[in-house]
Amino acid sequence: MSEEQSTYSANPGKQLVRTVDGVDYQRIPVKTHLITNTDDMADVVVRYAKDRMQEGDILFISEKAVACTQNRAIPMEDIKPRKLAVTLSRYVTKTPAGIGLGIPETMEMALRECGTLRILFAAFCSVIGKLLRRKGWFYIVAGPKARGIDGPTEGTIPPYDHYVVLTPD
């Protein structure tokens, strides 16, 4: 590890080395400017990562950053949840993983992204799953677009701490 690499630090609860199938992978965080919808992700990669990469490296980009460049980060105040979103969000299990669809604004965006019928069917399946003591059925049925919706959480960089971020296109 170079001297520069030894100065990297992981976010709380994260590690710089991940082991997958017995192979260690080093995660090197790359600090950028605040990425917005005015950025082109290819330009961001060239500007910040090109000189750090070596032959055989794999570059991972957070889907939240990609979504922001695609104008898929919506200010909370621009989302007007319908009654159905308010009602459904009350039944979402809160987890340490994040807010998920547990607030009306994120549930509203799930209804828009996935369709009302699909979300209602996912909610129905979730009830059946709970009766059978099985978790996760809602997100399995609702699909990746619902599963990937991020709401504002503590530690999110402003201004995105007041945004709902959808999955990238």
Model-identified regions with their sequence ranges:
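N-terminal and secondary-structure boundary signal
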Residues: 2-169
